[in-house]
Design a protein with these regions (language model features):
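N-terminal strand-loop-strand
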Residues: 1-36
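Short coil/turn motifs at beta-sheet boundaries
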Residues: 3, 80-84, 111
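Short hydrophobic/aromatic beta-strand or adjacent loop that forms the aromatic wall/cage
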Residues: 5-9, 84-88, 115-116
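Short, charged/polar surface micro-motifs in flexible loops or helix N-caps
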Residues: 15-19, 29-31, 42-43, 90-98
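Conserved hydrophobic/aromatic beta-strand scaffold that supports enzyme active sites
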Residues: 23, 88-90, 120
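Nudix hydrolase/Nudix homology domain
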Residues: 30-34, 99-150
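The catalytic Nudix box helix
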Residues: 36-69
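Active-site segment of metal-dependent pyrophosphate-handling enzymes
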Residues: 60-106
Length: 150
């Protein structure tokens, strides 16, 4: 059995009139679906370091404090079946007035140069995110469980 790929995913939450989650859509790959910041953990990184890097690379946001670990998703990749362990972490969004923006992915990974349409959406979500990335939202607050999962 192949070694599982180590990954991170970020629930970046802010509180306005109610709780909101940072999500994005690929402008270059519209069929990819709405997602949260996520990606691989490099050999020299721990999940905390990796999630901060991924959030900055994929959204441009930095200074998002990590609140804590939410859980580890052991499901394989939905298309390739490759085993993976995704560490889901809860982060607090920086104080900012931006509700939505376009970001060009930075870094050296395969998504470098892609454009993401980032935005905050109200919780609970009405439907699932790509790859069921919303699976653990209810662990942060049962009221944040995606409506289609109730």
């Amino acid at each position: 059995m192949p070694t599982p790929r180590r990954r991170v995913a970020a629930y970046v939450i802010r509180h306005r009139a109610g709780p909101e989650l940072l999500v994005f859509d690929h402008l270059d790959i519209p069929d990819a679906g709405t997602q949260i910041p996520a990606g691989g953990i490099r050999a020299d990184e721990d999940p905390h370091t990796a999630v901060l890097r991924e959030v900055t690379e994929e959204t441009g946001l930095d200074l998002c404090p990590v609140i804590g670990a939410v859980g580890i998703d052991h499901r394989p990749h939905p298309i390739t079946g490759q085993p993976r362990h995704t560490h889901v972490l809860h982060l607090h969004a920086p104080e900012d007035d931006h509700d939505s923006w376009i970001h060009t992915v930075r870094g050296t990974d395969t998504d470098a140069g892609l454009q993401f349409a980032c935005r905050f959406v109200s919780l609970p979500l009405s439907g699932s995110l790509a790859d069921e990335q919303d699976l653990f939202l209810g662990r942060l607050d049962p009221d944040w469980t995606t409506l289609t999962r109730r």
